[in-house]
Amino acid sequence: MQNLARDIDAILITGPTASGKSALGVKLAQRHGGVVINADSMQVYGTLKILTARPDESEMGGVEHFLYGHVPPDRAYSTGAWLREAEALVARLRIEGRMPVFVGGTGLYFKALTGGLSDMPEVPHAIRQRLRKRLMEEGAEALHYELSALDPETAQRVRSGDGQRIVRALEVMEATGRPIGFYQQSRGPVIIDATRARKIVVLPERPVLHSRINRRFEAMLGMGAVEEVRALLALDLPLEMPAMKAIGVQQIAAMLKGEMSEAQAIEAGAAQTRQYAKRQMTWFRNQLDETWQRIDAAEALGENH
């Protein structure tokens, strides 16, 4: 792969949480004169450095890292907002002749990078909040039944238990009078040409991944994750805010309230992380085509990529 930098314009690295993709990203950025750009929707938030496993100074290996920890936890941050920042960064890096190395576990970010993003309309906060409240009170199936009457085409594509997508479809319909499919047909510009990108998905063996997850979550508590959650809770944010949904926040919050012991919080947090990793693995296998190279992290770090 000596001619890699001449053959491609970007490196994309994804994989489940705790898979070792961050270390691989640093290695490849060092080798090809690049920078690392965050592609994880939780690592953008400033308060939760430890709990979201953002790389620290020693792990950055002297490589510049961008789009990490720059969003206040009380601010909503969409895929579109991330894509706009990524586009500006890529344009600058191309002028400077530096390689963008995208690293993260948010599959939608990579899909948007290489396929463009639908130009979705703004939805008033009041509409979104009201529908989310109804979801909690009435359940996803009731709202899916309503969606079937208003937008049968979308209802057929969305599972009756997928509350988040059901609410999204309903809020767009209510705000604009048009089905969400109308907006999904139009796509924004492609930022990264997939045919000129090195694309890697890191997929460790499940026992190895689970062992890493278990060790890492326990270590986080000793490294300051409890203090991070305490600071986050002091902001008194609504539970719907994305930062409040970060894995470990609710378990540590329960521990701080005396509702869980430390051991219970560790087990519950690790269990939620394992479930999340399983969903990520399923998504990567189903959504990433054969042009993505599937490797194990140990193999990746040992090879001359």
UniProtKB/Swiss-Prot annotation:
Its EC number is 2.5.1.75. SUPFAM superfamilies: P-loop containing nucleoside triphosphate hydrolases (SSF52540). GO terms for biological process: tRNA modification. It holds the Pfam family IPPT. It is an enzyme of class 2 (transferase). Residues 40-43, 164-168 are annotated as: Interaction with substrate tRNA. The keyword Nucleotide-binding applies. NCBIfam families: miaA. Belongs to the IPP transferase family. This is tRNA dimethylallyltransferase. The gene is miaA.
